[in-house]
């Protein structure tokens, strides 16, 4: 059998000027996804994918690095303005927003979209250390 040569899939460059930055900040990790206004992902980064492991993933610095990488990748697609949607209780929320601004993206709006139950599921039992 003849060996197939591996084809390198090149990312096509989309021309999008406005985007939405979704920041999901949990107690363990921070996920930054930048999409177009329809919700199609343009760029993403996580604290874990940046090389942070264990408890270092949950630091504001790790969130900062993830936001910087996502912003740089999105700017390659032409994104200049972002609306920020923040979800979750983690420590990387503010750091990620500040880094998006520092990377050169113009933040037009910041919304907190953390889901709050109207007394839904019973929460897990409290930790005793």
From Swiss-Prot:
Record keywords, A-Z: Ribonucleoprotein, Ribosomal protein, RNA-binding, rRNA-binding
First and last residue of the signal peptide: none
Keyword RNA-binding annotated: yes
InterPro entries membership: Ribosomal_uS11, Ribosomal_uS11_bac-type, Ribosomal_uS11_CS, Ribosomal_uS11_sf
Protein's job: Located on the platform of the 30S subunit, it bridges several disparate RNA helices of the 16S rRNA. Forms part of the Shine-Dalgarno cleft in the 70S ribosome.
Subunit organization: Part of the 30S ribosomal subunit. Interacts with proteins S7 and S18. Binds to IF-3.
Protein name per its UniProtKB record: Small ribosomal subunit protein uS11
The encoding gene: rpsK
């Amino acid at each position: 059998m003849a060996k197939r040569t591996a084809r390198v899939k090149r990312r096509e460059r989309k021309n999008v000027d406005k985007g939405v930055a979704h920041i999901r900040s949990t107690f363990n990790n921070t996920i930054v996804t930048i999409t177009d206004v329809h919700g199609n992902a343009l760029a993403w980064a996580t604290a874990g994918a940046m090389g942070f492991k264990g408890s270092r993933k949950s630091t504001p610095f790790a969130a900062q690095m993830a936001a910087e990488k996502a912003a740089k990748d999105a700017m390659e697609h032409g994104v200049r303005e972002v609306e920020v949607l923040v979800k979750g209780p983690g420590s990387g929320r503010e750091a990620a927003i500040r880094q998006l601004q520092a990377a050169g993206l113009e933040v037009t709006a910041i919304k907190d979209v953390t889901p709050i139950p109207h007394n839904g599921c019973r929460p897990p039992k409290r930790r005793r250390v």
